[in-house]
Amino acid sequence: MRLRHVVSSLDLTRDDYFRIFELADKFYDVKKLNYLSGKVVSLAFFEPSTRTAQSFHTAAIKLGADVIGFASEESTSIAKGENLADTIRMLNNYSNCIVMRHKFDGAALFASEISDIPIINAGDGKHEHPTQAVIDLYTVYKAFGEIDGRTFALLGDLKYARTVNSLLRALTRFKPKKVFLISPSQLKVRREILDELNYPVIETENPYDVIQEIDVLYVTRIQKERFVDEVEYEKVKESYVVDLKLVNMMKKDGIILHPLPRVTEIDRRVDKTVNAKYFYQASLAVPVRMALFYEVLGDREDD
């Protein structure tokens, strides 16, 4: 069964995740395929992006699709007053799939409800970033050969980081041993997210208390652009720095992930450690997104 939309990490079943991992393995070293020949992908980025936009663009091209779209809201008719619904309807006329990033929570879900073609959420406000969660879990799977039974820790901005919401929700499809949530009190995971989780969760403010238990340390930057109050941002912007002292206390085979971009939350000297996997993680974005495109468009009969 092909995927219809990928708006939330909960749109994927456990089997979907493993099928995407298997496809990503096959696509990793591929130069060019024609699976999506004759298809058009719209990249509708109403909010700025570098890595996500470029990796989706590359993934589509490597599968043989043509790519159209825009990189900011200012370059669209929305700047002239057009509403989002009309923009989505117009893109339906030009393409077979829309990859969408937007500053408002729930924008991708709204688009999926009016679109006749698949919507892939490339990040909507502080809500979700489901394809990043697939990349995150694929990296864990490649490192350990499994996801079940592993101990995770998410560190940093757990309130505004949409990658955190998607990863926590994605983990409900697996059986982690436990998940530590490490953040300042002002940046804790929102209660409505915690209420959805079906695995053991422990909240703390001190990474040193739990670092020796962790298999996967997932670090996020403080989301400056989500803060309404600049003063509040200044209070927490350097709450945590993953440095060599902390890393040296990790398990030898423990891994450090980061969805990027990194600011100051990981000391650059950590980059050379065996635990640092965030650049490898980034290298998996294209094959994972190729797999996702294949799942929503490959071998799909036109309506």
Curated annotation (Swiss-Prot):
Its EC number is 2.1.3.2. Keywords: Pyrimidine biosynthesis, Transferase. Pathway: Pyrimidine metabolism; UMP biosynthesis via de novo pathway; (S)-dihydroorotate from bicarbonate: step 2/3. L-aspartate binds at K80, R162, R221. It comes from the Archaea. One of its GO terms (molecular function) is aspartate carbamoyltransferase activity. It is an enzyme of class 2 (transferase). SUPFAM superfamilies: Aspartate/ornithine carbamoyltransferase. GO terms for cellular component: cytoplasm. Pfam families: OTCace, OTCace_N. Carbamoyl phosphate binds at R51, T52, R101, H129, Q132, L260, P261. GO terms for biological process: 'de novo' pyrimidine nucleobase biosynthetic process; 'de novo' UMP biosynthetic process; glutamine metabolic process. It catalyses: carbamoyl phosphate + L-aspartate = N-carbamoyl-L-aspartate + phosphate + H(+). Heterooligomer of catalytic and regulatory chains. Belongs to the aspartate/ornithine carbamoyltransferase superfamily. ATCase family. Catalyzes the condensation of carbamoyl phosphate and aspartate to form carbamoyl aspartate and inorganic phosphate, the committed step in the de novo pyrimidine nucleotide biosynthesis pathway. This is Aspartate carbamoyltransferase catalytic subunit. It comes from Saccharolobus solfataricus (strain ATCC 35092 / DSM 1617 / JCM 11322 / P2) (Sulfolobus solfataricus). The lineage of its organism: Archaea, Thermoproteota, Thermoprotei, Sulfolobales, Sulfolobaceae.
